[in-house]
């Protein structure tokens, strides 16, 4: 059991019988782990002055409707923007500090490490900051011909929908179950690395034209106008690929 996040481990830890397990949570030991923090800034970085410590900047955590964390600290803001830029791309704490240091161009690298040491062990124990001993085998970009694993494509094709949620589940590269609606099922089935994004969009329009999918507007009316249908599919495919990216489902 992972008592930090209060859930069962989905991986196995093998230990030599004659070697004691180090259970101390120390910053020096954590520096070798990869970390990710799923936050989004209210304001993009190019619209603020990181060095202005009179300006309070807030960040959302995952899909929470209200801001999760706010700060006026220039160092903390730089660190949080680094994490926001690297959702689904876990990086070591020292690399976080180096990237944040580049954003400000002043202070010392040790100042950034000190802030990380002061705050981020707490975030780990609260379950907000995720840590990995090895970097997940997923990519953090959407390529010209996106690809997911053969296992995920198999799950998308054969899994049964939950009648209550109208969702099915696929397994990401962290062995977590990710819920997907029916339109994402059809997108995942095409992510074998041979179809570019335009191919995927054409495939989705074919699904709609064949009545496998129904495109509806916000009033629940079917979308039939070709121009509106193209805009609808463009949006659905793009937002779905972004969801797959941040949930460790893409491998190529």
UniProtKB/Swiss-Prot annotation:
Q: Name one GO molecular function term.
A: lysine N-methyltransferase activity
Pfam family of the protein (one): PKMT_2nd
Any idea what this protein is called? Answer: Uncharacterized protein RP027
> What's the source species for this entry?
Rickettsia prowazekii (strain Madrid E)
